[in-house]
Curated annotation (Swiss-Prot):
Any one GO molecular-function label of the UniProt entry: DNA-binding transcription factor activity
B box-type zinc finger locations on the chain: 8-50, 51-93
Residues where Zn(2+) 1 binds: C8, C11, C31, H36
Keywords, alphabetical: Metal-binding, Nucleus, Repeat, Zinc, Zinc-finger
Name the record gives this protein: Zinc finger protein CONSTANS-LIKE 3
PANTHER family the UniProt entry points to: ZINC FINGER PROTEIN CONSTANS-LIKE 3, ZINC FINGER PROTEIN CONSTANS-LIKE 4
UniProt similarity note: Belongs to the CONSTANS family.
Residues annotated as transmembrane: none
GO cellular component: a single term: nucleus
Localization per record: Nucleus
Residue ranges annotated for the CCT domain, each copy included: 229-271
Length: 294
């Protein structure tokens, strides 16, 4: 609250709470009711609340984060203080036309009404005392759910625990949000009756009825006796002793074929290329076949 509030331009004795744009006058609640209810023309004057910070100028915007009406100067000073305040959402102030009483203030009238007329500040997440939610889904048709299972051929070897009939009560949403402790009975909205003889729907497939068992698939560690370990070490040492580091030819036929192939500058070449590089008279006798001589 500012140290010195602006006085009403009409009575000069009470702090002004709003500003009339048509009359360009700062008025208190009593004077506003007297002036703007005198005739129909005066009732159409636009009025806005004063700034809630300085209380010296008409409000220009409404800050949704602070829920406060601010003038141009206070809006600039407050929302330029730090980066967090710069992200506050502000909307232009909405003028009103109804006369207000002396008890009504700007903080009580700051509301964020969307285009559909819904009150955003009255959040549905905040519960008020005395509110009782009775059957939120009363407009929907919920048939009774009956979950049953059939015993398999082996008797009582069912995998799924038997919870057979689930009936939804109509009034299971009757709970008081203002209660300090939620009783355990508030959650007993499902009437469960366990019966293994009134079973209609099989929970376990009839073909096979195989139960899934969790087995340990890890490979067990091989435990060797000292004698077995000593034998393995000896075999390894014998193999290492007989190792030969000489060059071995794996494919002798490939090596022989590679030695027979013609080469040009160390690279394999086709036989036609080798004939041209031999300097033979290929141009004259190129079209004639070579007759082998015996």
């Amino acid at each position: 609250m500012a140290s010195s509030s602006r006085l009403c331009d009409s009575c000069k004795s009470t702090a002004a709470t709003l500003f009339c744009r048509a009359d360009a006058a700062f008025l208190c609640g009593d004077c506003d009711g007297k002036i703007h209810t005198a005739n129909k023309l005066a009732s159409r004057h636009e009025r806005v609340w004063l700034c809630e910070v300085c209380e010296q100028a008409p409000a220009h915007v409404t800050c949704k984060a602070d829920a406060a009406a601010l003038c141009v100067t206070c809006d600039r000073d407050i929302h330029s203080a730090n980066p967090l305040s710069r992200r506050h959402e502000r909307v232009p102030i909405t003028p009103f036309y109804d006369a207000v009483g002396p008890a009504k203030s700007a903080s009580s009238s700051v509301n964020f009404v969307d285009e559909d007329g819904g009150d955003v500040t009255a959040s549905w997440l905040l519960a008020k005392e005395g509110i009782e939610i009775t059957n939120l889904f009363s407009d929907l048709d919920y048939p009774k759910i009956e979950v049953t299972s059939e015993e398999n051929s082996s008797g009582n070897d069912g995998v799924v625990p038997v919870q057979n009939k689930l009936f939804l009560n109509e009034d299971y949403f009757n709970f008081d949000l203002s209660a300090s402790k939620i009783s355990q009975q508030g959650f007993n909205f499902i009437n469960q009756t366990v019966s293994t003889r009134t079973i209609d729907v099989p929970l376990v497939p009839e073909s096979g009825g195989v139960t899934a068992e969790m087995t340990n698939t890890e490979t067990p560690a091989v435990q060797l006796s000292p004698a077995e370990r000593e034998a393995r070490v000896l075999r390894y040492r014998e193999k290492r002793k007989n190792r030969k580091f000489e060059k071995t030819i794996r494919y002798a036929s490939r090596k022989a074929y590679a030695e027979m192939r013609p080469r040009i500058k160390g690279r394999f070449a086709k036989r036609t290329d080798s004939r041209e590089n031999d300097g033979g008279d290929v141009g004259v006798y190129g079209g004639f076949g070579v007759v082998p001589s015996f």
